[in-house]
Amino acid sequence: MRIGVLTAGGDCPGLNAVIRSVVHRAVDNYGDEVIGFEDGYAGLLDGRYRALDLNAVSGILARGGTILGSSRLERDRLREACENAGDMIQNFGIDALIPIGGEGTLTAARMLSDAGLPVVGVPKTIDNDISSTDRTFGFDTAVGVATEAMDRLKTTAESHQRVMVVEVMGRHAGWIALESGMAAGAHGICLPERPFDPADLVKMVEERFSRGKKFAVVCVAEGAHPAEGSMDYGKGAIDKFGHERFQGIGTALAFELERRLGKEAKPVILGHVQRGGVPTAYDRVLATRFGWHAVEAAHRGDFGRMTALRGTDVVMVPLAEAVTELKTVPKDRMDEAESVF
């Protein structure tokens, strides 16, 4: 069997662990040939790929990013790929394609599968927002990075009696903000799933200061937004990939809190530091398991599906099921977090 693998969309820790696992399982166990398309679906369309053998994946388990490169594909080019799916199978001689990516990548994978490509998807995203899987690799690392940042910021906030507003990633799902905020003991958490009122945060800070706790840390997801009429804040434009560009809720909220409280409030935007660096042990293991099961699925002819974690088991689920809707933070998880503010 000849297997093609690619990484697309935003990078995250653990991608190389999947690539390594695919190569080891395919080559060692089945004697397969594995090729890696460069820069995601763009490499698939442009015919840019390289052979992946055991030497090519040596030493990459703990490396962040992706040795294959990644990119986002514009919608016109995706349509082009679907229209030429049959030609791509013939030109590259691939018997299976394993795209590793988030919601956008898996949506494209579903379209390519519907067009006739033998596809087995592997979900990744630091946002943990893909339906049908309990966890995605990359998420654990991102939560750890955000938690450590807030742990560090608490000391400087306390020293200067400041309010620190820490903005983390999460356009439409607030999983990183929820879990890192809980782990770091943030005093307020703002999620995309529930509009917030700055007045509640002002009250929280004032109550803390009245008890002699003269600092506060607020964790806010980039997609969080204030309740209508509670503060001035505008949403951003849509980029060419269909993603909303946010205007910086962390900065806007810090300004609003400083204005209302008369106390110094500092925004800290973690940004892409959450995507980089060494993956945690958990993410390495999950990514490795996903790669193993993707190869097994390909050899069973179990196409049009993706790997997923259910409890402690890795199972295969239809791509259509995985991309129907985003997995957002449910009310009970928000209530749990609020109980320890």
From Swiss-Prot:
Its main location: cytoplasm. Mg(2+) binds at residue 103. InterPro entries: ATP_PFK, ATP_PFK_prok-type, Phosphofructokinase_CS, Phosphofructokinase_dom, Phosphofructokinase_III, PKF_sf. ATP binds at residues 10, 72-73, 102-105. SUPFAM superfamilies: Phosphofructokinase. Its cofactor is Mg(2+). Its EC number is 2.7.1.11. Keywords: ATP-binding, Cytoplasm, Glycolysis, Kinase, Magnesium, Metal-binding, Nucleotide-binding, Transferase. Belongs to the phosphofructokinase type A (PFKA) family. Mixed-substrate PFK group III subfamily. This is ATP-dependent 6-phosphofructokinase 2. The gene is pfkA2.
